[in-house]
Curated annotation (Swiss-Prot):
This is Major pilus subunit operon regulatory protein. Plays a role in the inhibition of methylation at the GATC1028 site located in the regulatory region upstream of the pabA promoter. May, in conjunction with the Mbf (methylation blocking factor), inhibits deoxyadenosine methylase from methylating the GATC1028 site. To E.coli AfaF and DaaF. GO terms for biological process: regulation of DNA-templated transcription. The gene is papI. The keyword Transcription regulation applies. It comes from Escherichia coli.
Length: 77
């Protein structure tokens, strides 16, 4: 993964206290699939975490340790 893209994603998540895959993709001018790919790599590196997976629900991404227990992760898209 390029350092540029890694830094852009981490900066976005820091500024917005997390975000949906589609929001991140739009902000970085990449496809949803590209954003998801980069986010999964960052997750493997232990730098980001995502909301629990639920069928039909949007995935929210956060900097590792930033997701709060009471945070609402139930809205779609």
């Amino acid at each position: 993964m390029s350092e540029y893209m890694k830094n852009e994603i981490l900066e976005f998540l820091n500024r917005h206290n997390g975000g949906k895959t589609a929001e991140i993709a739009e902000a970085l001018a990449v496809t949803d699939y590209q954003a998801r790919y980069y986010l999964l790599l960052l997750e493997k590196e232990g730098m980001v975490q995502r909301s629990p997976l639920r069928r039909g629900m949007a995935t929210y991404w956060f900097l590792k340790g930033e997701m709060q227990a009471g945070q609402n992760c139930s809205s779609t898209t």
